[in-house]
Amino acid sequence: MTAIAPVITIDGPSGAGKGTLCKAMAEALQWHLLDSGAIYRVLALAALHHHVDVTSEDALVPLASHLDVRFVSTNGNLEVILEGEDVSGEIRTQEVANAASQVAAFPRVREALLRRQRAFRDAPGLIADGRDMGTVVFPDAPVKIFLDASSEERAHRRMLQLQEKGFSVNFERLLAEIKERDDRDRNRAVAPLVPAADALVLDSTRLSIEQVIEKALQYARQKLALA
């Protein structure tokens, strides 16, 4: 009997540093990577490429079931590969974002994408980045980490990111948006943003990203008995 590949789930709110941590862990362990937050955007882009109606659940389900997507982390950069093509930039357009919100509203599409996400589980292992990876998608994962940070710290990090890109931002507005999103995510009826009962809750508020990576890798290696 073939042993099932291990999964490390990294859940947490927006701006906690999940993406950076997941890329670093995938590279350190040489494991596969799943960015669940990008899945709906990738499906939306595939629908646009193949002229599939994003308002038709019946048309979207088969596309979701056979979505040809890979995530590759190289030197800290995440490449999103759809049907052999790097679409990392294309999935960030407003057109794709709008289409993604439409496709995400269909229950059967969500179910098809849930199965598709579980199919990423492959040897030697998978790092799964999301909001309900440890509670819904991979409830049997041997290592679960919930990465958190104060709303103020996450707003500060987001402000710096936007300023580096040349945007003028208002800290108070950013903070209000983050608090509103937190409240929505934590109180929604389906798959609320909460740590799994068996997850390590790692608060990154006062930690550097290097310290977060070190703590997460140390915990994962202990749990999995990796060298």
From Swiss-Prot:
A Pfam family per the record: Cytidylate_kin
Gene this protein is translated from: cmk
Documented EC number(s): 2.7.4.25
NCBIfam families: cmk
Keywords: ATP-binding, Cytoplasm, Kinase, Nucleotide-binding, Transferase
Reaction catalysis annotation: CMP + ATP = CDP + ADP; dCMP + ATP = dCDP + ADP
The UniProt record lists the keyword Nucleotide-binding: yes
Listed name of the protein: Cytidylate kinase
GO CC terms of this entry: cytosol
Molecular function GO labels: ATP binding; CMP kinase activity; dCMP kinase activity
Origin species: Citrobacter koseri (strain ATCC BAA-895 / CDC 4225-83 / SGSC4696)
GO biological process, one term: pyrimidine nucleotide metabolic process
Residue ranges of the TM segments: none
Localization in the cell: Cytoplasm
Residue sites binding ATP per the record: G12, P13, S14, G15, A16, G17, K18, G19, T20
Family: Belongs to the cytidylate kinase family. Type 1 subfamily.
Domain of life, per lineage: Bacteria
Major enzyme class: transferase
